[in-house]
Design a protein with these regions (language model features):
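N-terminal, polar/charged subdomain of small-to-medium soluble alpha/beta proteins
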Residues: 1-111
Length: 111
């Protein structure tokens, strides 16, 4: 079983540039957790609660990171610790300051 959250929007103060650290910006997270048979019983107590996953992402993003890679890695590690999935994939996107691209992104996978 795979659960997914796409486009979880979080405001944070991540980045290398002083204006990114000072003013902050929006970040979008896509999270995939491989959870085995958890949830097949149709009981929330047996499953991974999507709200708790979103809360964990927000908590990690409440810290400051210079690099998207570090933010994605720490988020993936925290989700592994809290929910013990078989695998987790975290992708973080942002609109980069000073680059003429739609977005930049970093992806971390565990294990």
């Amino acid at each position: 079983m795979r659960i997914e959250l796409h486009g979880l929007e979080v405001f944070g103060y991540h980045g290398v540039l002083p204006e990114e650290q000072r003013d902050g910006q929006r970040f979008w997270f896509d999270v995939t957790l491989e959870v085995g048979d958890r949830g097949a019983s149709d009981r929330l107590a047996d499953a991974v609660d999507y709200r708790l996953v979103a809360d964990a992402v927000r908590e990690v993003s409440g810290r400051r990171f210079e690099l998207l890679e570090a933010l994605a890695t720490e988020t993936a590690d925290e989700l592994m610790r809290r929910f013990e999935p078989e695998q987790v994939v975290v992708r973080v996107r942002k609109q980069p300051a000073g680059l003429a691209v739609e977005y930049s992104a970093a992806t971390a996978e565990r294990p």
